[in-house]
UniProtKB/Swiss-Prot annotation:
EC number: 7.1.2.2
Keywords: ATP synthesis, ATP-binding, Cell membrane, CF(1), Hydrogen ion transport, Ion transport, Membrane, Nucleotide-binding, Translocase, Transport
Subcellular localization(s) per the UniProt record: Cell membrane
Membrane topology according to the record: Peripheral membrane protein
Family: Belongs to the ATPase alpha/beta chains family.
Source species, domain of life: Bacteria
Organism: Streptococcus pneumoniae (strain Taiwan19F-14)
Lineage of source species: Bacteria, Bacillati, Bacillota, Bacilli, Lactobacillales
Residue ranges crossing the lipid bilayer per the database entry: none
The name this protein goes by in its record: ATP synthase subunit beta
UniProt xrefs under PROSITE patterns: ATPASE_ALPHA_BETA
Record SMART domains: AAA (SM00382)
A Pfam family per the record: ATP-synt_VA_C
């Protein structure tokens, strides 16, 4: 085990000098610095660059407070390794695989795997055309998710990405009954804490491993924590042959941390100040999140869109890797429609007649057509009013508004805030409800009866309460 000495510390960047004759550590190797002679507290560094003349530049995974020049640094000879296997279920980890849930720490002999690996080869990959039911109408009808697929939840600040991902955990993890891995990348600690206690109460935690590298962590930890969660998920897929659900909140923070690290390493920034290696880093992460012949990984990733600009390089780079996109729209939040999923901008590879069936496809296409036409008529309505529309257009607008409200529903995880019980709607019920609205069966019911409800039966019950 070769050793060097700290030459300089610049924030989270630590330069380490290895004497002549000492073997230099490889890129991505983990180095360890002990803060005192008793060797109780250590700081882990990851090698990022070799500067020449025995000097390597590293990124710290923890705060560098207390590090000084001349301190001894040991090369572990391998990348950061984290615990894997059944023992990780029900536990909460940080980027290094240390437990942070105040329960017993992992034993030294627990099985560990390095966080840096190659993606599965082309012939190992497997594709599926099985739909993953979420119980959320707007998703199941217009942008369905594939089992073993990749889903992106796009949205600006405060439009409901985390609430949607928590509802998906609530619905899918409980229905799915398999293994789930939740990775919190650079998000609020409070949200992670809420999610942990909620999962503990519901019992889902027993089949879930949680990994957190939150907003207050150094950029190195935020950049690598997604790989820690992915390594745990890969083990269940490859060794245990399981179907795994991988939730990542938020992929943008992974990019943001990479940008910070890139600047600290002295690389020339690229477009909008992002790192020049943006596409490579995203590709290395996303290509590992895949399904093989041994097992599947279904990933649901929240992706923050800076200033609601979808052309920003960070969300634009993520787009290329996804099977389904669920776009959250601020205008719908302003209308009080939750989840604020844009039915026209969201898309899915799975919305094809050979996958979802002819009836589902036809209903989804007609819903999109009606909403698109309503969108076109809104300018005329705003300038000239409803009176200038033909009778046919008035009927279409009335149905479009009912459809728009019926695409909303109350969430189980938001019940504590709204006071309204959440609902889970099976796909068959969703398709039937929208088909009947399109057929004009409920033209006589008030628009408000369609807002925030589950199935079409709930609409009828709500309308009866309103006196219709």
């Amino acid at each position: 085990m070769s050793s060097g000495k700290i030459a300089q510390v610049i924030g989270p960047v630590v330069d380490v000098l290895f004497a002549a004759g000492e073997k230099l550590p490889e890129i991505n190797n983990a180095l360890v610095v002990y803060k005192n002679d008793e060797r109780k507290t250590k700081i882990v560094l990851e090698v990022a660059l070799e500067l020449g003349d025995g000097m390597v530049r590293t990124i710290s995974m923890e705060s560098t407070d207390g590090l000084t020049r001349g301190m001894e640094v040991l090369d572990t000879g391998r990348p950061i390794s984290v615990p894997v296997g059944k023992e990780t279920l029900g536990r909460v980890f940080n980027v290094l695989g240390d437990t942070i849930d105040l329960e017993a720490p992992f034993t030294e002999d627990a099985e560990r795997q390095p966080i840096h690996k190659k993606a599965p080869t082309f012939d190992e990959l497997s594709t599926s055309s099985e739909i993953l039911e979420t119980g959320i109408k707007v998703i199941d009808l217009l942008a369905p998710y594939l089992k073993g697929g990749k889903v992106g939840l796009f949205g600006g600040a405060g439009v409901g990405k985390t609430v949607l991902i928590q509802e998906l955990i609530h619905n899918i993890a409980q229905e799915h009954g398999g293994i789930s891995v939740f990775t919190g990348v650079g998000e609020r600690t409070r949200e992670g804490n809420d999610l942990y206690w909620e999962m503990k109460e519901s019992g889902v935690i027993e089949k879930t491993a949680m990994v957190f590298g939150q907003m207050n962590e150094p950029p190195g930890a935020r950049m690598r924590v997604a790989l820690t969660g992915l390594t745990i998920a890969e083990y269940f897929r490859d060794v245990e042959g399981q179907d795994v659900l991988l939730f990542i909140d938020n992929i943008f923070r992974f990019t943001q941390a990479g940008s910070e690290v890139s600047a600290l390493l002295g690389r020339m920034p690229s477009a909008v100040g992002y790192q020049p290696t943006l596409a490579t880093e995203m590709g290395q992460l996303q290509e590992r999140i895949t399904s093989t012949k041994k097992g599947s990984v279904t990933s649901i990733q929240a992706i923050y869109v800076p200033a609601d600009d979808y052309t920003d390089p960070a969300p634009a780079t993520a787009f290329a890797h996804l099977d389904s996109t669920t776009n959250l729209e601020r205008k719908l939040v302003q209308l009080g429609i939750y989840p604020a999923v844009d039915p026209l901008a969201s898309s899915s590879r799975a919305l094809a007649p050979e996958i979802v069936g002819e009836e589902h496809y036809a209903v989804a296409a007609e819903v999109k057509r009606v909403l698109q036409r309503y969108h076109e008529l809104q300018d005329i309505i705003a300038i000239l009013g409803m009176d200038e529309l033909s009778d046919e257009e008035k009927t279409l607008v009335a149905r479009a508004r009912r459809i728009q409200f019926f695409l909303s529903q109350n969430f189980n995880v938001a019940e504590q805030f709204t006071g309204q019980p959440g609902s889970y709607v099976p796909v068959a019920e969703t398709v039937r409800g929208f088909k009947e609205i399109l057929d004009g069966k409920y033209d006589h019911l008030p628009e408000d009866a369609f807002r925030g409800v589950g199935s079409i039966e709930d609409v009828i019950a709500k309308a009866e309460k309103m006196g219709f």
